Amino acid sequence: HACFRLTAENGTVIVTDPYDDSVGIRVPKLTADLVTVSHEHHDHNNLDIVEGRPKVAREARAAQVGGVTTQAVTSYHDDRGGALRGRNSIRIFYIDALKVVHMGDQGCLPADPVLQAILNADVMMIPVGGFYTIDAKGAKEIVDLTRPKCVIPMHYKTEHCAYPIAGVEPFLEIMGAEGAKPVRTLSVMPGDVPEGVVVMEAAEEF
């Protein structure tokens, strides 16, 4: 969905947007030092699945844990200035000299100051499924404007996902990445960042 586990070289663990069972995907048990929540919808703020008494960064709050720094910029969950679904926090992480951007439930093309803040990320996780968020075309527009090295699509239909959203295929097609094979984990280091689109396996697959 939009939940990722990021592990720094020193072992610090960050979990983003933990979801609940309404999504239809198996809900994992996780342990973390820091949890970030892009907005207060139940498929993005289920802190009960995260053990370890983590620090929690909600909305646009900055945080620093175990050498990992995170800040956020505010945008919207829809294309009407938040009138339909409220605000969305785009989270920027600085991990081991890498810039990692998690777009949350982005619902529109961000304003120019927001685009500048997320420019040239090493890794960007971006929703592509539409309906609740931007779709494949909207995601590509943001990618083209901000030029991340590695793009990880999220928030799309999988076999057991109960939401009325599109699968990842339209995004892969529009990005020229139809042959991308899902991977369970991804190792990223400064100077060694996989370029292009990387598809992660959903939790339902393992």
Residue ranges and their predicted role:
Residues 32-33, 122, 149:
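Conserved acidic residues
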Residues 39, 128, 154-156:
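Short secondary-structure boundary segments
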Residues 1-3, 88-90, 197:
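Short hydrophobic/aromatic beta-strand or adjacent loop that forms the aromatic wall/cage
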Residues 13-17, 69-75, 92, 99-105, ...:
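Active-site-proximal beta-strand elements of phosphoester/diester hydrolases
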Residues 5-40, 44-60, 74-88, 106-117:
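Pre-active-site segment of Zn-dependent metallo-hydrolases
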Residues 79-146, 163:
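Active-site-proximal loop/helix segments of hydrolase catalytic cores
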